[in-house]
C-alpha cells in the first residue's frame, strides 16, 4: 500500500510572520506619503526658485516698473535685521514663531502670474522674486500693518520698563547742547582754556557763572597768534600769593605762571599751601580753596621753575617779589623788570608804576580789572619788554660791558645820557 502524504498544517503563525517582516517598511512609506501630502510647499518651493532664476529681462515699460518696485522691496531691510539685538533678545521665541506663521498665512497661494513668459507663484514673490505692480501695494500694506503692530509692542514694553525704573520727564530725552560736554567739576576755566582753547574757556566760564575779564582784543595784543609755543631764551614769570598768619599779612606762594617770548603759556601750576591759609585774597589773586587743594607740592614747583629759568632772561613786573616767594635767585644781568625801567617811569610819570597803569598808557589795554590772572600779567610784562627790546638790550649791554651806546646822528658816544637799568 502506498503511504499517504501527510499534509503540513499551515498554521496562521507562519503566514503572519512573513507579513510582519514587511510592516516597518510599509509604515515608513505610509508616513512619507502622508508627510508629502500634508507638506506640498517644500516641493513647490524648490521648483519655483529654479524657475525664477531663468527669468528674462523686462521688455515693456510696465514690466520694467513693476520689477523695479519689486527690487526696491527686496533692498529694504527686513524687520528682524532692522530691530536691534537687545529688542530681539527680549522678545520670546513663541511670539516670533506666531508672527512668521501669520505672514505665511496672509500670503495667498495661487497658481502664479506670467512675467516675461515665465510662471511664478505668489509664495516665490513673498520670498523676494519679481512680481507685477498689482501685487505690490497689497504686500506693502500687509507689511506696514505688521511693522506697526511690532512698534506698538515695543512702545508698550518700553513704557512698562520706564514705569519700573521711575517716571522721567520728556524733556530729558531731548539732546542737550554741546556746551555741557566741556563741563568739568572743580577745574579752573583758565586751565580748560590752556588745554582746549579759548572757546572752551569762554563756555566753561559761562557755565560756572564767572565773568571773563579778558576781552578778545587783550589776547590779540598780548599774545602772538600762530607763534612758537615752546620755551624761548627769554621768558616772563608772575606769581600769585595768599595770606597766612593771624592777620593774613604774610604771603606764601599759590600759583606760578611762565610765558615765552610770544606770550604763549609754557608753565602754569597751583601750589599746595605749606601753612594754614587765613586769607585767600580772591578779589585780587583769583585763588580759591579748591584750586590749591589739588596743587603741586612747593618743592616740586620750585625745582621745575629753577630749571626753566636757568640760563634764560627773566622778564616780569616787580620780579624780585616773585623770586623771593620762590626762594630762588637769578643774576641781575638776566633780569628785565618793567617796574624799574626808566623810560617807562618817564612816560607814566610815576616812580613805581603799576602794571595796570603801564598797560593803559603804553599798550592801550585794560588789565587787572577784576581778579588778577598770573598768566595775563606775565603776558603783559612780556609785551612791554618786546616793545622796547632793542633799546633795553643796548642799555643793558652798555651798563655791564662799559661800552656806551652810539648816537647815529652825532656818531659818537652819548656821555650825558644815563643808561637805564
Curated annotation (Swiss-Prot):
Subcellular location: Nucleus
A GO CC term attached to the entry: nucleus
Predominant place of localization: nucleus
Polar residues bias: start-end ranges: 11-24
Tagged with keyword Hydrolase: yes
Keywords: Exonuclease, Hydrolase, Nuclease, Nucleus
Species this chain originates from: Xenopus laevis
GO biological process terms, semicolon-separated: DNA catabolic process; RNA processing; rRNA processing
InterPro entries according to UniProt: Exonuclease_RNaseT/DNA_pol3 (IPR013520), REX4_DEDDh_dom (IPR037431), REXO1/3/4-like (IPR047021), RNaseH-like_sf (IPR012337), RNaseH_sf (IPR036397)
Keyword Hydrolase listed: yes
Basic and acidic residues bias: start-end ranges: 92-107, 140-149, 161-170
EC number: 3.1.-.-
UniProt region (Disordered), positions on chain: 1-51, 79-179
Gene Ontology terms, MF aspect: 3'-5' exonuclease activity; exonuclease activity; nucleic acid binding
Record-given protein name: RNA exonuclease 4
Basic residues bias (residue ranges): 25-36
Location of the Exonuclease domain: 234-385
